[in-house]
Design a protein with these regions (language model features):
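Membrane-proximal extracytoplasmic
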Residues: 1-291, 301, 408, 574, ...
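Hydrophobic transmembrane alpha-helices and their membrane-interface caps
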Residues: 265, 292-301, 305-361, 401, ...
């Protein structure tokens, strides 16, 4: 009832994507509100707080007393710190650990920039009053008497002062009155007087209760590698930098450790930033490898260190300029910006290679000076460079305007790549010609006829070029027939693309896994701990596992005695082979616990993008959209999960949450209670204090205000009979047993109620079986969910929601990229036919990318789409190099066919050189291993496949498309005089 009121107030919040509320049987509730990426978190928090403020008028007083807390934080844990005793320490009780962490560590970490929330897996100390109900009855006392006595005798006393104004003018001294009203330790609390008897004897608290300095809450405990510990999980604030925040947290922990007691130590057993650190380091290595390979390709073709040096100088200058712009835009060095840099290496050298190769060719053919050759070369290639630069930078612009989380992924990649390409084009028109004119030396005619390895290479390449030119002349002569082949390739592209399995991002080996432990409903903590110990023993036997942090009483599904969550962290990627990958370890654990002795133990891969869900795979919310009731919703859940169990497309699927559990229903005869003079408020207060716990007030412990908590002693709350043995006071002050007006019965009931976007719902999570993508599993899930009874609906959430958004945007993304490139070429060439002949080559590159990904068993994910957009630009680039020259030759009076064949021959060498440089620059991505390897391979494989087809098929089809299209449209060249004046 409370959360439904709050949910109503949240509807209409600006930037709201979805919200989910979780109501627990313990009386707590949480609403997680998710906003669109890019929403200002501070404004969103203020908006939510204002909406909740308006709803407070409809809140019960108990809720207002406890208060509503609003926090802004990202989902998922960034890291977990653990505080434990050193080996050989005298102490072993975790109460002191939890209290020390609460006093000296947690708040220090909460204050750090980037920390949104700290989830503490323990509690600070409290004065625990363990009541013996039987002793209370023996003294004729009730739990209310205990509560009232503590409240009355543990108080702050502001006694005032003597001699203070107004007073006598002769008063010369004032002083405050100090009265010790608060109690400080178990001995003092034990002296609290519950009753004074007529004979002068006293009944004290110590007579009916055991007092100790214990934990405020015993609901959650944790272990590190089997050793009791306390820990805290850090969650990022929205928009915070994970690496920076993790570094600050670890630095602060190191500083605080200097003040730890001698027998305490800390560790960070779980750290998601480690993957990002290592992955970025791997990409930097890939960047260096790409530069070396590109240098070797350039040296192979240019065969002179000076020639090779020029593009090698241009690349760092471009990257430096790109980093400067990224800094000004507030971008960070992350996986996507680094991917952009790696792809840029091969693209950046293109413009410089085109200039240098043309200068070198002119000097070799005509024997003129470097300065003269540079001037002549720039007249020939300036138009092509401008076209290539504009096309390659423009093709990435649509990526920057994508919505959702995928837009965030695309934005930094596209902007960093587009900026670097613009710098490359600018330098190719200014800096590169200057370097050519000053660094290059004159070379004699016939330079390519030298002896040795390079001479053999040049002669071999010349023969290939001549054969290519001969083949081109034959193909162009039959352009119409080969356009039918082209149409077949386009049809093949559409066929294979539609059969690519859909996914959002590839599953990564993040260096850890998540293990969810769920025992049967109603299972005790003892049973949960036993299963946890069995899990720890298994993980200890695995060579790949470095450490295990286990939390009992807590899971992403909810809190309860039958729940636990483990975070096994693996050794470094360099120390593990393929047989010890995260996927292999997850499979081994799930196989070992396939038939557990007690409950279920399920290992899942973490989400590849931290903050989008608790695990990889898919996440669905089954919803009661028509008020059919909880029973119908549960039946739909069982039907759906039953269908999935026998479906080969699913590895697993399960309900994420706490299942229905045994409940002891107390049937209170209110008429009897009223007749006996017992109020319902007294009944509820006694029950919650005895079987739950009740916070009475605070006491001062070592300078910190901590709570006084009362609860029945453990042995007096273990059985159903102990409920009926409780006594409550009536209006006359006499004790009445609950059994006089209460009966009990067993039933099953929910311990957790979940609502999604205001509808009763059930969380269902799962993953695709090997050989199937998450997109295929989600499509199958939608098919099965559509067969459920009327009134039952579903919605995707987390990573799955973003995957659906991404899939819906793909078509418009590609169409917009092609349209932008086409319109740019139309404006550049002031023609419709020439841009069309360039754009016809795009499918030729795309088919190579699709086939490469399909043969590799990969999916149509975000990284593949990034690669495909890149191929659109690069395919157009190769076509522009040929079409630009063909257009000039055609305008000079050559026939359409001769112009196309000659342009293809002249541009064959730079196209092969630039394409090979790009392909070799991307090979380290396609062959990546270790942290981030899946993402690198996903982007590298498609790009290499696309570039191979765009190069080796493209050089054949560009002349064909050019001749066929211009012949079909009967275009005429511009007059020679006009072309000449345009050249001037």
């Amino acid at each position: 009832s409370v959360t439904s009121v709050l949910e109503e107030s949240l509807n209409g919040a600006r930037g709201l994507l979805y919200f989910e509320s979780t109501n627990n049987s313990t009386g707590t509730a949480e609403i997680v509100v998710t906003f669109e990426p890019g929403t200002d978190p501070d404004l969103a928090q203020v908006d939510v707080q204002n909406r909740l403020k308006k709803a407070e008028a409809r809140m019960p007083q108990a809720v207002l007393t406890q208060g509503l807390q609003v926090e802004q934080t990202s989902a998922g844990f960034l890291l977990i710190y653990a505080l434990s005793y050193k080996e050989g320490a005298q102490r072993s009780d975790t109460t002191a650990l939890g209290d020390y962490a609460a006093r000296n560590i947690n708040n220090e970490l909460r204050r750090l920039p980037g920390v949104g929330k700290l989830q503490f897996f323990s509690s600070e100390a409290a004065m625990r009053v363990w009541i013996d109900p039987q002793k209370l009855v023996g003294f004729g006392l009730s739990i209310d008497d205990v509560s009232n006595a503590i409240r009355g005798q543990n108080v702050q006393v502001p006694a005032g002062a003597f001699g203070s104004a107004p007073g006598s003018s002769a008063q010369e001294l004032t002083a405050t009155l100090a009265v010790k009203g608060t109690l400080d330790d178990p001995q003092e609390f034990g002296q609290v007087v519950l009753r004074a008897n007529q004979d002068g004897s006293l009944v004290r608290l110590a007579d009916v209760a055991r007092l100790e300095l214990g934990k405020e809450s015993y609901n959650i405990s944790s272990r590190l590698n089997g050793t009791p510990t306390v820990g805290g999980a850090i969650q990022l604030s929205p928009g915070a930098n994970a690496i920076q925040t993790a570094t600050l947290v670890k630095q602060r922990l190191a500083e605080l450790s200097a003040f730890f007691p001698e027998d305490m130590q800390y560790s960070v057993p779980y750290d998601t930033s480690r993957f990002v650190d290592v992955a970025i380091e791997k990409v930097i290595h890939t960047l260096i490898e790409a530069m070396v390979l590109v240098f070797l390709v350039m040296f192979l073709f240019l065969q002179n260190v000076r020639y090779t040096l020029i593009p090698s100088i241009v690349v760092p200058v471009c990257l430096l300029g790109t980093l400067m712009v990224m800094y000004l835009l507030g971008f960070s060095v992350n996986m996507m910006t680094m991917f952009g840099m790696v792809l840029a290496i091969g693209i950046l050298v293109d413009d410089a290679i085109v200039v240098v190769e043309n200068v070198e060719r002119i000097m070799a053919e005509e024997g003129i000076s470097p300065a003269e050759a540079t001037v002549k070369a720039m007249k020939q290639v300036s138009g092509a460079i401008v076209g290539i630069t504009l096309v390659l930078s423009a093709v990435f612009l649509p990526l920057a305007f994508m919505a959702g989380s995928v837009g965030v992924i695309y934005q930094q990649f596209s902007v960093s790549l587009a900026v670097s390409i613009l710098f490359s084009g600018f330098l190719a028109l200014t800096f590169t010609p200057a370097l050519c004119a000053t660094l290059l030396k004159p070379i004699p005619e016939g330079h390519h006829e030298k002896r040795g390895f390079f001479g053999a290479f040049n002669r071999g390449f010349a023969r290939v070029t001549e054969r290519y030119s001969l083949l081109n002349s034959k193909l162009v002569a039959r352009a119409g027939r080969f356009m039918l082949v082209y149409a077949g390739l386009v049809a093949m592209l559409g066929y294979f693309y539609l059969r690519l399995p859909e996914a959002f991002v590839p599953a990564e080996d993040l260096g850890y896994m998540v293990v969810d432990v769920q025992l049967p409903p109603g299972a005790s903590r003892v049973r949960t701990d036993a299963t946890g110990e069995e899990l720890e023993r298994f993980l200890k036997s695995r060579e790949a596992v470095a450490s295990v942090f286990l939390i009992s009483g807590f899971s992403f599904s909810g809190q309860g005695d039958n729940a636990a969550l483990a975070f096994p962290t693996f050794k470094d990627w360099s120390e593990r082979g393929a047989e010890q990958s995260a996927a292999a370890e997850i499979a081994a654990l799930n196989e070992h616990f396939a038939l557990p002795d007690d409950g279920t133990v399920m290992a899942v891969s973490p989400p590849p993008i931290n903050g989008l869900g608790n695990s990889g795979g898919f996440a669905l919310r089954l919803m009661d959209r028509s008020g059919v009731g909880r029973e119908a919703l549960l039946q739909a859940r069982d039907t759906l999960l039953g269908e999935i169990q026998t479906n080969p497309k699913f590895l697993y699927a399960m309900m994420e949450g706490l299942a229905e559990a045994p409940q002891l229903r107390l049937l209170i005869d209110r008429e009897k209670a009223r007749a006996l003079g017992v109020s319902f408020e007294t009944i509820s207060g006694t029950l919650s204090a005895a079987f739950g716990s009740e916070v009475i007030n605070d006491f001062t412990n070592a300078g910190r205000q901590q709570r006084v908590v009362i609860q029945a002693e453990q042995g007096n709350r273990m059985t159903p009979e102990s409920v009926l043995e409780l006594y409550v006071p009536n209006a006359a002050g006499n004790l009445v047993p609950l059994s006089a007006f209460v009966s009990v019965k067993w039933e099953e009931g929910p311990v957790q109620l979940v609502r999604y976007n205001g509808y009763p719902s059930i969380r269902i999570v799962g993953d695709a079986a090997p050989g199937f993508s998450t997109g295929e599993a989600m499509a199958e899930m939608e098919r099965l969910a559509a067969q459920l009874p009327a009134g039952i609906g579903y919605e995707w959430t987390g990573l799955s929601y973003q995957e659906k958004v991404s899939a819906g945007q793909a078509t418009s993304l590609f169409a917009l990229a092609i349209l932008v490139v086409f319109l740019l070429l139309v404006a550049l060439y002031e023609s419709w036919s020439i841009p069309l002949s360039v754009m016809l080559i795009v499918p030729i590159g795309a088919i190579g990318a699709v086939l490469a990904v399909m043969v590799s068993g990969m999916s149509n994910d975000v990284y593949f789409k990034v690669g495909l957009i890149t191929i659109i630009g690069l395919s157009a680039k190769n076509a522009i190099l040929i079409v630009e020259f063909a257009k000039e030759l055609w305008e000079q009076g050559h026939s359409l066919r001769d112009a196309a064949i000659e342009a293809a021959r002249l541009r064959f060498r730079p196209i092969i050189m630039t394409s090979m440089a790009f392909i070799l620059g991307v090979i380290p991505l396609a062959l990546a291993s270790g942290a981030g390897a899946a993402s690198q391979r996903a982007i590298g494989t498609g790009v290499i496949g696309g570039m191979l087809s765009a190069t080796f098929l493209g050089v054949l089809f560009v002349p064909i498309c050019f001749v066929w299209l211009l012949s079909l449209l009967r275009s005429k060249p511009a007059p020679i005089e006009q072309a000449a004046s345009a050249g001037e």
